[in-house]
A protein has these predicted regions:
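Extended beta-strand/loop cores of jelly-roll/beta-sandwich
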Residues: 1-100, 107-110, 210-239
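Functional-site microenvironments in short loops/helix caps that host divalent-cation chemistry
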Residues: 82-209, 219
Length: 239
């Protein structure tokens, strides 16, 4: 049953309509004919012995042996390019989400403008009254150097742990598809906006940025992975 959540508006967390036995691992949601990560991706680094440890979400993973995981309650990876996002998804047997399946997952079973409905609700997602790290750290300067400052997303009231905005979900059970970090898709765009902007390039699930090359990254760019049902097994544990 759907559950109410206290906050600045009468949020209702949608009931997840699809569960175990749908061909997707527990960390992914079944969305039509795709499996979609429930949470924005974080990374684990793999050493020469095969041991895995968390990779810093505040640094670019360029050249590191990493793979993508979908976990609740962790800071999602930022500072990642489309090129590196693809590599991280592939290392986990997944792929970077295709633009149409990403958009379908964001809109939910009811095909709404935002994950939670057709009307914007301030504070439902991580996109309201957040702090600009460029203003805090660099007097508003936006350059390749300042926008990849590892301290950017460590400032208060910036990037939030995955799943912390309880209302930013839908009946598929995917979280944070609007706000928090931009999410790269395989057409070279990133979608959904980030914690400072979810409207400049489209509202909510329609948000789409196409201005950057696949090798581009900054403090706002993240991703999530997708897969075909049955390709990974349903007992994959990413906890």
């Amino acid at each position: 049953m759907s559950s109410p959540v206290a906050g600045p508006a009468a949020y209702i967390i949608p009931e997840v309509k699809l569960g175990p036995g749908n061909g997707c691992p527990n960390s992914m949601a079944r969305v039509d004919s795709s499996c979609v990560d429930k949470y924005e991706a974080s990374l684990v680094q793999i050493d020469e012995t095969g041991k895995e440890s968390p990779f810093s979400p505040y640094e670019a993973p360029n050249g590191h042996n990493v793979r993508a995981v979908s976990r609740e309650g962790v800071v999602p990876q930022a500072h990642i390019s489309m090129v590196e996002a693809k590599r991280a998804c592939n290392a986990s047997g997944k792929r970077l989400c295709r633009a149409p399946e990403w958009k379908t997952a964001c809109k939910g079973p009811e095909a709404t403008r935002y994950p939670y409905g057709d009307n914007r609700v301030p504070g439902a997602c991580v996109d309201t009254n957040r702090t600009s790290p460029m203003a805090t750290l660099h007097q508003g300067e936006h350059s390749a150097q300042t926008m990849n400052d590892p301290l950017a997303n460590q400032q208060e009231n910036t990037l939030a742990p995955t799943g912390s905005a309880a209302a930013c979900t839908n009946g598929y059970g995917v979280h944070d598809m609007v706000g928090n970090v931009h999410e790269w898709t395989d057409d070279g765009s990133f979608r959904g906006g980030y914690y400072l902007d979810t409207s400049e390039n489209g509202e909510g699930c329609e948000y789409r940025t196409t201005a950057h090359a696949p090798a581009y990254y900054d403090y706002s760019t993240g991703f999530r992975c997708c897969a075909d049902p049955g390709s990974l097994g349903e007992d994959v544990d990413e906890s």
